């Protein structure tokens, strides 16, 4: 009986530790110059085009090109 109780306690302790590690790892943030997304936030600055930067630079698209 004691062996069964110990193994169940050990199993529950492992599950609790894994849940704790998951919370710690999912709440981390990334420094400038690394990849970011909606679910992987930047520590400081903003996520611009998938990269952590201090400020977003203006985007130049087809409307910003010079046409003759």
Swiss-Prot record:
Pfam families: Conotoxin_I2. GO terms for molecular function: toxin activity. Residues 64-68 form a propeptide. The modification Tyrosine amide is found at residue 60. Keywords: Amidation, Cleavage on pair of basic residues, Disulfide bond, Secreted, Signal, Toxin. Expressed by the venom duct. InterPro entries: Conotoxin-I_CS, Conotoxin_I2. It is found in: Secreted. Residues 1-26 form the signal peptide. Its main location: secreted. One of its GO terms (cellular component) is extracellular region. Disulfide bonds join 29-43, 36-48, 42-52, 47-56. The cysteine framework is XI (C-C-CC-CC-C-C). Belongs to the conotoxin I2 superfamily. This is Conotoxin Mi11.1. It comes from Conus miles.
């Amino acid at each position: 009986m004691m062996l069964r109780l110990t193994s169940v306690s050990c199993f529950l302790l492992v599950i609790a530790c894994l849940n704790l590690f998951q919370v710690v790892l999912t709440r981390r943030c990334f420094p400038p110059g690394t990849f970011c997304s909606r679910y992987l936030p930047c520590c400081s600055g903003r996520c611009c085009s998938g990269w952590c930067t201090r400020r977003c630079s203006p985007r130049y698209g087809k409307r910003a090109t010079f046409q003759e």
